[in-house]
Amino acid sequence: WVEGCKGHHDDYIFWAICKDDESEDIIGWASLANINKVNKSASTHSIVIGDRDYNDGFTWIETVRFMFEYAFETLKLNRLYGVSLVGHPMSNIIGDLMFMAKEGVLRQAIFKNGRFYDLLYNAILRDEYYIHKENGDYEMRKIIKRLRNLRHG
């Protein structure tokens, strides 16, 4: 699978998520998909953290911050969107923390584990990203403060 992800692809990019230590062991992966150069958009297709010791949210936040920066600053995209299962705790919270606007729900759009699930679409635009970046909203201390506010209210 990893070998198939290597190389040049016009419409998707995969990254390994590694430990921030001397080992640099792979703990997961992330990808941008559906990269459209005409519409200047892409999907935060997936974030998978396989090591439970790093599945506490901070690795997710760091990964999303990296994906935002890469999408808007390197690829010069105008729109970045994500799709997640309604009720998926990590995806839904991360979308709120990173100022992704809820665009809509596709009802019973996916069949998984013997039942249908709704899908939530979130997105952020280039100008919104830069406003929040300039305000320092993507600094970890501000993200943690927003997380506390979400949990308490």
Regions from the PLM with identified roles:
Residues 1-11, 19:
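Active-site rim helix/loop that mediates acceptor-substrate recognition in acyltransferases
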Residues 18-153:
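Acyl-donor (CoA/ACP) binding surface of acyl/acetyltransferases
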